[in-house]
Amino acid sequence: MNSKDSNTVPVYTTNTGCPIFNPMAAARVGKGGPVLLQDSHLIDVFQHFDRERIPERVVHAKGSGAFGEFECTDDITKYTKHTMFSKVGKKTPMVARFSTVGGERGTPDTARDPRGFALKFYTDEGIFDMVGNNTPVFFLRDPAKFPLFIHTQKRNPQNDMKDATMFWDYLSQNAESIHQVMILFSDLGGTPYSYRFMDGFSSHTYKFVNDKGEFYYCKWHFITNQGTKGLTNEEAAALDGSNPDHARQDLFEAIERGDYPSWTLYVQVMTPQEAEKYRYNIFDLTKVWPHKDVPMQRVGRFTLNQNPTNFFADIEQAGFSPSHMVPGIEVSADPVLQVRTFSYPDTHRHRLGANFEQIPVNSPKCPVFNYSRDGPMNVNGNQGNWPNYPSSIRPLAKVQYEPDEGHEKWVGQVTYHMDEITDVDFEQPRAFWQNVLGKKPGQQDNFVKNVAGHLSGAISPVRERQYGVFTRVDSELGRRIREATEAEVKKMEEKAPKPINKGEPHMFQGSS
């Protein structure tokens, strides 16, 4: 908030630089007379005020972030030619944004929800965005389901309230979601203590390409150096009321006092030959690559050491997209990732404008030359007098690219495909229940309690269907979820006043 010269008090001006006598005074006819339209400053203030809000993100609306740098600590040039990893010790500036997913900008940081984990690297060859979550999997693997799923995480269109029946109705009909559900309703995955104490994941499978044109499949893991820490349902609920900005405050204050948070990047790498023989579909967003199958390899470390100067300019206007790629890193055949490469920049153009890449936080540090021109809010010189077409007089050079043609040849007929549910979809959720939660004292009990408290708000047919999904994971889990949930339902029914039906039926009336 300080001026450039701390000894000089800035003069208040209009947005065009004209000094103003008193910003809180209005031109009027006498002391008590009407306001005059000639007071252009007053008119400008209100016109700008009327336009201060931009559309919030349709997902990940509530978030926080900071600036920092990534340092390469280990050589992976045999996998990728990307300049960020070109040599050990190489440093790359970056900005990070962490967020909840389903809520609006005003919702609590401690809501049970996945957390967004978005990173923007200002590399020598352009912007590279890694747009992940704090969970290694997601609720779906068929991209057409994404908007429908997100609708169920939002509000009931009739009463604009969160609705447990909507939430579980979708999940119980789409059982591939169960792996993410298991993580979400654990204390670590669904209610992390704060952004500093959670890991981040690419979730998707990406491709590394080296300087020989050879490619490898990879998954990215950002492991917090602060250690993971979660909240119980009760702790999260208490913070919801006492400090809904808890995670934002924790991140900001830690950086302000010099306690800079950091994360270590590891990758899992698989050759195309290994991928063809692997027991799981490597493009399935609902599954992980077990570390015993594909070991983690350390790559580097990023540290956040600078808070935003202005939240709106630096964080709210930041636009992250999986389509922001650089040489040496490419999109795989993961269908959800491929659709995200369209959806994310599209929503930024709606939210921030056609030239959102020119906003300082979104601008690359390297030169930009192409044939894109004009459009609203084009403020970077519009590439001067360079031709806006492929010119023989002032040509642009082209980089060399020789793809590996030995793999990823796709031949087939056009079909409308949706993956079917099989027993394989329950293997990893079962391992999470038995081998992860089962080895941490109290975590299975907390999981059952967390699910029961939420699922009890859904109508009976939806609850029954979801019990069946949990039973396919583990019969004991299904039994415990059913007993705990129905006990919660009974308590709610005993406390609830008798309903009075008037007018039109609600969205789910008659279904229970």
Swiss-Prot record:
Matching Pfam families: Catalase, Catalase-rel
Positions annotated as active site in the UniProt record: 60, 133
Oxidoreductase as UniProt keyword: yes
Basic and acidic residues bias (residue ranges): 488-505
Residues binding heme, per UniProt: 344
Full protein name: Catalase
Biological classification of the source: Eukaryota, Fungi, Dikarya, Ascomycota, Taphrinomycotina
GO BP annotations, alphabetical order: cellular detoxification of hydrogen peroxide; hydrogen peroxide catabolic process; response to hydrogen peroxide
Enzyme class name: oxidoreductase
Keyword annotations from UniProtKB, A to Z: Heme, Hydrogen peroxide, Iron, Metal-binding, Oxidoreductase, Peroxidase, Peroxisome, Phosphoprotein
Function statement: Catalyzes the degradation of hydrogen peroxide (H(2)O(2)) generated by peroxisomal oxidases to water and oxygen, thereby protecting cells from the toxic effects of hydrogen peroxide.
Keyword check for Protease: no
Cofactor requirements of the protein: heme
Catalytic reaction(s) noted: 2 H2O2 = O2 + 2 H2O
Classification via CDD domains: catalase_fungal
Region annotation Disordered: where it falls in the sequence: 488-512
Family: Belongs to the catalase family.
